[in-house]
Amino acid sequence: MNELVIGLFAALLGAIVSIFTLYTNYRSSLDSISGWRSKLFDAASAKEITLKEVQVLRTALRYEPTRKVQEYTFAWISNIMIYYCDYISLKYFEHHETSLLYQEQEIIRVFIRCLLKNHWEYNASMVSSLKFLKIHYKASKQPEFIRETYDKAKAISRTLENDDEEYDLIEKINKKMMGSV
């Protein structure tokens, strides 16, 4: 009887490990097939960020912003990224330009780095690999890099002239999104 229980336990454990490994490999292969991380790296390291790189970032984000978000979460910062990319795209599309201001380029670089960092953290986390089992894990503390990303982008936007419509744009997006305006 003990041998049967031990055998069943070993088989169950083997099945769980196999499923976990298959799931992890599946996620990894999707990343390598699409090459989106590589495209984001290329965009972030480009000498000059143009509308093309803005569209690469926007494409890597969700289709629509999340409706209700909590400050300093990834959903929150990705909403800011979405609104900012859409703003930049419209601004330069209307004027048929592709060259962004230096500050705009740096904000896009910061956003791309944040997206890459979040993806790395997500894939590196053992807990994230168990999401297919519907085991929900809420971190008690949000990753610090999200707050740092917001602070860097906000600081860069404040280097524009006070009369520029983009001065404090990151903060304005946040206030509007969070209902403070």
What are these regions (language model features)?
Residues 1-28:
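Membrane-embedded hydrophobic alpha-helical segments
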Residues 65-181:
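An amphipathic alpha-helical interaction surface
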Residues 10-11, 15, 43-46, 60, ...:
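A sequence-composition feature that detects small, non-aromatic residues
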Residues 26-67:
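Amphipathic, membrane-active segments
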Residues 2, 6, 30-37, 74:
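Amphipathic, non-membrane alpha-helical segments in soluble helical-bundle scaffolds
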